[in-house]
Amino acid sequence: MKRNPSSPLPLEGIRILELGMVYVLPLAIAPLAAMGADVVKIESEVRPEQTRWGPQPNNQQHEPAYNYGGSFHMLNRNKRGVTIDLSKPKGRDLFLRLVAVSDVVAENFTPRVLRNLGLTYDRLAEVNPRIILLSSTGFGQTGPWQNYRAYGPVTEAVDGLMELTGYADSPPQRGGSGGLGVTFPDVAGAYYGTFAILAALEQRERTGRGKWLDLSHYEAGVATIPEAVLDYTMNGHVQGRMANRHPWRAPQGAFPCSGPDRWIAVSVATDEQFVALASVLGMPELANDDRFATLRARHGCQDALDEFIAKATREWTAEELERTLQAAGVDAAVVANSRDVWMDPQLAHRGFFEMVPPPASAPDVGPRPFARPGWKISEASGATRLPAPDFGQHTREVLAEYLGLNGGELDAFVDDLAAEGVIADKPRKGMVARDPTDLPGMLEAGLLQEVDPDYRKRLNDHLAGRNAPLANW
């Protein structure tokens, strides 16, 4: 594909072959697709993308289930989908032909997989010396842990983050079970991968040769806790859990406001900010109390101080207190739930959410709002160009473009690959959609705050006038 120097999308013309499963690698490649790269997501009938099966829209099962998974649609917009079975010789040959005319290959298999397939970086570089290979794994391509299985909760534990998450008198907590709400090392690892690819593309402009990028989620996770690591290397301190508090700011925490489960986060860095906080909350005398007058004193009396603050914040709505404290120069923000985020006026002003049309196989779902990348490029709309692909939707199209085939030659080539089981238009039988989520059970367990029966109307009303209406909802 020829690059268009006048395109507002900086990666237009860059071809990326994504052998990505689940979350981290698809997330790493998503920003590159948004920046214009032609991303071809490769699956096979025996190894379809796991996120295809759920969660299903409106917590209802749809057919074909493998084209309806919400996570799949979030992570794979702006990508084209093909199927190639790499376990078959013809599949590997076909893959190498695509590598020969591509810029980047990204994969997140365990290290032994590509070795066993004979698709190492050295082999890819033989057919294309300019190819860049990103290998995204839990623990890297070398070392005693190289073939360990690693999902986010595993790396979250081993990289030290879990030990730092939670309350001092409670066991360690992982992000997805009461800490961060997401598996943070997954996100960090993903964007390290994005950055590495961009850096390798830039270097290739100078050297003319590709690179092998060996990404370890473990190492990316350790890099997210630099203060704790540095505290040990410099002082011998092994940090523990401090809940919402801070090593030197005080007060800091989440305080209750009026309304069910409404909270405000406050973080005070200076004595001047504390004077302002005490004044806004109607307790100016606290600033003259010897227990709270200085930062050092406040740090030693946080339990008592938190009680005073919590009693006062209950008289405010979170939104009004946020505005008032910010105007007074105090760091404060509403503790937003997912509905608050969708309804946020700042994000609405920025056009952060956009309506994305449904894939061809799922018209009954209708357009859905999705988050755009967290950046804007001048002269580029940032709008989604393609919905996430149906299974094998673009196989024929990509083979024609990348290999220069057409007409009868293309027909014969595709027919032969299909007959050999190299390509397919649906996953192998036996793979089914996830069961609908047990909403009552999740509510009872506290994993959901509530189920909003009017969520579609709320979103429709909020986005009306900014984006296309939510047709077919």
Segments from the language model and where they lie:
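N-terminal helix-loop segment corresponding to the beta1-alpha1 unit
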Residues: 1-206, 390, 397-473
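A glycine-rich dinucleotide-binding beta-alpha-beta segment and adjacent secondary-structure elements
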Residues: 328-385, 438-440
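Aromatic-enriched alpha-helical interface/lid elements that frame and gate functional surfaces
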Residues: 251-332, 339
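Conserved Rossmann-fold dehydrogenase catalytic segment
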Residues: 141, 171-183, 205-221, 241-247, ...
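Short Gly/Pro-enriched turn/cap motifs at secondary-structure boundaries
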Residues: 63-64, 72, 239-247, 254, ...
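Short, well-ordered beta-strand elements within core beta-sheets of diverse protein domains
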Residues: 17-20, 83-84, 262-269, 306-316, ...
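Oxidoreductase and adenylate-handling cofactor-binding alpha/beta cores
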Residues: 167-169, 190-210, 223, 227-235, ...
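Glycine-rich beta-alpha junction loops
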Residues: 46, 139-140, 217-222, 259, ...
